[in-house]
């Protein structure tokens, strides 16, 4: 069981939460990025550098993640592919993607892409708030408790 992070777009405050969680849970944490990352020394934390390019990091996460893993990403298509493989997916704002919600999120993403392509300014997400950080930490903990329960 591994926690995979789409690290190029993951906020540093979320990475810090994940570093502490990896130590506490004693789970491998792999940060996948197309640039060098500085991470704390730990036998549980490692980086995986991939070539620069569109979806290269996403494709590597999909290739390596397995059922039971957790993928941290705000990228809806990556989350959908991880869920198809049996992994859990969580965004940095603490929203867990599920098979029931991912289709709706993909549809909304495609709709927003269409609006942007037609020249309509849609704006980006708000900056990460303290509430978002707390929601992320709480959902990560909830996932971990579910994992422990399923192990019996």
Swiss-Prot record:
Pfam families: DUF188 (PF02639). Disulfide bonds: none annotated. Belongs to the UPF0178 family. This is UPF0178 protein YaiI. The gene is yaiI.
């Amino acid at each position: 069981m591994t926690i995979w992070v789409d690290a190029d777009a993951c906020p540093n405050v979320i990475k810090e939460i994940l570093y502490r969680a990896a130590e506490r849970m004693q789970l491998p944490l792999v940060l996948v990025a197309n640039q060098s990352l500085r991470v704390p020394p730990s036998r549980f934390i490692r980086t995986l550098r991939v070539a620069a390019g569109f979806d290269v990091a996403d494709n590597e996460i999909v290739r390596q993640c397995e059922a039971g893993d957790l993928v941290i990403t705000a990228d809806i298509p990556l989350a959908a592919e991880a869920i198809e493989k049996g992994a859990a997916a969580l965004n940095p704002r603490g929203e867990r993607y599920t098979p029931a919600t991912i289709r709706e999120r993909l549809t909304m993403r495609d709709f927003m892409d269409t609006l942007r392509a037609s020249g309509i300014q849609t704006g980006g997400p708000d900056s990460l708030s303290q509430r978002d950080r707390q929601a992320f930490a709480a959902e990560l903990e909830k996932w971990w408790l579910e994992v422990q329960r399923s192990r019996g």
